[in-house]
Amino acid sequence: MTTRKNTAKNLLLGYLKEQGITARNSKVGVNFEYDGWNFLLWHDAEEPKFFRLTLPGIFDVTDENYAQALMACNTLNWRYKVVKASLYEYEDEGKRRASVWVCFEQMLDDGIQRQEVVERAVNALVEAAEQFQNLLT
């Protein structure tokens, strides 16, 4: 049984509060900024113990750099076990756009320590985002 206390959202909010980091609720989850990076925890009411922390929009994809961005995503996905990179397509002001997102996913169990999972996720995402940028140079 999932209690309100042991959800991914509450785990993250508890950690951010302990660290003095301000969080903002959005339609899709919880946003926060850390060390110059903007993070988003997707909240899934169907799976409240599914921890999906993302770094959205780390790279804008265009027709000209699409193949290079896709190959860099594939390379990251082979190198990292829990962090995955993907091209995310969206509509902005009536125009179709795409960007690269990196995502850390983990199912939470009742014994998990919030500091451990959040710090591991944040560090892995930042490392992967920096590695992605290096692959493009």
Language model features: what each stretch is:
Residues 5, 9, 66-69, 118:
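Generic alpha-helical secondary structure
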Residues 28-34, 53, 98-102:
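Generic recognition of long tandem-repeat/solenoid scaffolds
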Residues 55-103:
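Short, internal acidic amphipathic alpha-helical interface segments
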Residues 36-67:
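Long, continuous compositionally biased terminal/linker segments
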Residues 108-121:
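A short acidic/glycine-rich loop-to-helix N-cap element
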Residues 1-46, 82-88:
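Charge-rich, low-complexity N-terminal segments
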